[in-house]
Structures are given as structure tokens and as C-alpha cells.
């Protein structure tokens, strides 16, 4: 705000599908607005709205390292990757804990990032399912993405941008504990474009795994999701944003 008052050339970046109050306020005073979703020019009172995507880390999922060996997984089984962020997500973790009997009898396997906050509690359950690999945090996300046939995740802005780039079939469970309900709005936008299934946080405990199992067996839907996510992906967002900024200097 001070920069614009002093007549410096300024820009903002809105990462979510619906802008927060601060960016809506600043949008009236900045030179450029970078966004990651379509139709935000209707919300911002500014003609210079550019949809260049969110800057992400570009993982190389074509690495030669064997990801199944790294995670001690069976390369002949379909894999569900479950992510709840670095701290974890209670509802997503309950969606696994409450369905251990289904996992035990299944032909698929699960790579489960519990988050640091829930890890010790989950280990105390002494889970012994051979087709369930439990991690507090996954450092090698490139390998995790490579083994995944489908991914279950929260719906943060950067997570969605990264998952669009990866373009694996996706189930999003937006957190209800986010200012302006950004995660739900983000997830709805991806769902509207055919890039994911959407499970409400309150339903994850009972419905999440069933949705994942059904998706594993639905080849047509998986192909559609991959194509939709690929169209939404903007892997060169960081470079393109910087280039536009340099043009203004």
C-alpha cells in the first residue's frame, strides 16, 4: 500500500480461486494482479489481471530411482497416496483409521502421510497392515507422486497447483478451518472443471476411502481427471510472473 502511495510500480499475486479482503483492497492501487484461476477479472477492479498460475516446485516424477523400493511398496499393486499436510489432517487420518479392515482385505496399497501432529498417536494403534505404509512426513514427494495411482489431499492453493502439474487422479477434502473458506472455493473450481472428486471434511471419516476405491476402478474418470488437471497446470508460473514484472521495470 505504501509503495503504491509513493508511486512505485507494484504487483500482487492472488493464489486462491477467490481473493481475500487484503488483495481486494490492494487491487485498486497496484499495476499488475497475478492470479491462478479464471474469471477473477470480474472480481478485481483492475484491467491488468493475468492468469499465470501459482509458482510451484516442479518435481521430476520420471526419476530413475525405484519409488516402490524406496517406500517398501509392491509395484504390482495400485497405490493410493494420502496427504494431509506437514502437520496432518484429523478427518483424513480418521478416513484411514476407520477403514483399516477394508484396507487389510483389499488388493491395493496405501502410502499415508499422517502429519507430525498425529504420527505418534497413530503409531500407538500398532497397525500391522502390510499394504499400508505410514510416514509422518514424506521428503521425497517426487517418488510419492510417481507411485500414486490416485491422490487424496487438502485443497490449499499451492497444493492444488502442484497436483495439477502432477496430473494424477485426485480427491480433494477442503479444510473447513480456513479464512474465507478458500479451500472449499479452490476445490469447487477444480471439481467444476472435472479435475477431482470432492469430499466434505465432515464426510471424510466414512466416505473418503470408498470414493478412492471406486475411483481406482473407474478408468474413464481417471483419464478425464488427468486431462482436466493437465489443462489447468501452469508449470512455468514463476518464470512467467518474473518476466512480466521485469517488463514493468
Can you say where each PLM-predicted feature lies in the sequence?
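Active-site-proximal region of nucleotide-activated glycan assembly enzymes
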Residues: 5-65, 73
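Well-formed, non-transmembrane alpha-helical positions, independent of function
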Residues: 24-25, 42-43, 125, 143, ...
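Donor-nucleotide binding loops and adjacent catalytic segments primarily
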Residues: 64-66, 73-151, 183-188, 192, ...
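A donor-sugar binding/catalytic signature common to diverse glycosyltransferases
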Residues: 141-182
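Conserved acidic donor-binding segment of nucleotide-sugar-dependent glycosyltransferases
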Residues: 197-203, 214-219
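Short, hydrophobic alpha-helical segments
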Residues: 212, 216-220, 245-249
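A short, well-ordered alpha-helix in the C-terminal region of glycosyltransferases
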Residues: 221-235
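C-terminal alpha-helical cap of glycosyltransferases
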Residues: 234-249
Amino acid at each position: 500500500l505504501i509503495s503504491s502511495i509513493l508511486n512505485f510500480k507494484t504487483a500482487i499475486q492472488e493464489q486462491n480461486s477467490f481473493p481475500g479482503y487484503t488483495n481486494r483492497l490492494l487491487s485498486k492501487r497496484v499495476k499488475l494482479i497475478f492470479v491462478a484461476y479464471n474469471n477473477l477479472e470480474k472480481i478485481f477492479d483492475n484491467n491488468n489481471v493475468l492468469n499465470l498460475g501459482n509458482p510451484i516446485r516442479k518435481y521430476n516424477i520420471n526419476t530413475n530411482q525405484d519409488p516402490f523400493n524406496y517406500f517398501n511398496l509392491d509395484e504390482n499393486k495400485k497405490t493410493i497416496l494420502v496427504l494431509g499436510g506437514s502437520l496432518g489432517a484429523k478427518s483424513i487420518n480418521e478416513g484411514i483409521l476407520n477403514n483399516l479392515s477394508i484396507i487389510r482385505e483389499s488388493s491395493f496399497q496405501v502410502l499415508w502421510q499422517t502429519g507430525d501432529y498425529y504420527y505418534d498417536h497413530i503409531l500407538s494403534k500398532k497397525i500391522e497392515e502390510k499394504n499400508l505404509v505410514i510416514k509422518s512426513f514424506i521428503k521425497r514427494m517426487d517418488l510419492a507422486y510417481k507411485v500414486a495411482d490416485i491422490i487424496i489431499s487438502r485443497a490449499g492453493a499451492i497444493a492444488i497447483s502442484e497436483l495439477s502439474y502432477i496430473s494424477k487422479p485426485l480427491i480433494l477434502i477442503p479444510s473447513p478451518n480456513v479464512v474465507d473458506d478458500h479451500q472449499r472455493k479452490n476445490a469447487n473450481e477444480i471439481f467444476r472443471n472435472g479435475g477431482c472428486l470432492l469430499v466434505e471434511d465432515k464426510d471424510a471419516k466414512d466416505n473418503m476411502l470408498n470414493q478412492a476405491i471406486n475411483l481406482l476402478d473407474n478408468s474413464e474418470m481417471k483419464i478425464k481427471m488427468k486431462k482436466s488437471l493437465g489443462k489447468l497446470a501452469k508449470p512455468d508460473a514463476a518464470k512467467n510472473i518474473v518476466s512480466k514484472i521485469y517488463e514493468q521495470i
